Amino acid sequence: MAGEPSSNSWFRCRRIVEFRDTDAAGIAHFSAFFFWMESAEHEFLRELGIRVVDNAPEDEESLRRELASSEGVGRELEVSWPRVSVSADYKAAVRFGDTLDVFIAVAERGTSSITYRFRFENSGNLVAIGTVVVVRCLMRHGMKPLPVKIPAGISERIMAHQLPSE
């Protein structure tokens, strides 16, 4: 079934619920899941050889040509992946000391965006699911991030982890 972590699409990493991640009741605070999604995404990208913040993007020449007329494009190019949407649904509580398997896969890819799906499991039991949408952007000092196309080389590596169609 699409969405199950047995699919080869899923990348898995582990996170231990630290004391700082819990609330007064000793249960993981809802916000901890957002940090875990971001750190899992970063681990996933590192594994694929993709920088989270890239000062020398592989498509630098085409970016410079495409953006030649844009304001604020100087000698330094910095490309990153800001979040534009995040959500989580919680199924069961996790506590200090629990070990979570965090699974990440690609649900969709647009021209400049990626939608990730996350599954959190504790001892094989589903405890939460999440979604994060990121957009590849040119980051310009003092200016709004500018969405830019995901280059083919990056797209190929990421799409190897796309979930099967439902």
Task: Walk through the language-model features, giving the residues of each.
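HotDog/MaoC-like acyl-thioester-processing domains
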Residues: 2-8, 90-99, 106-166
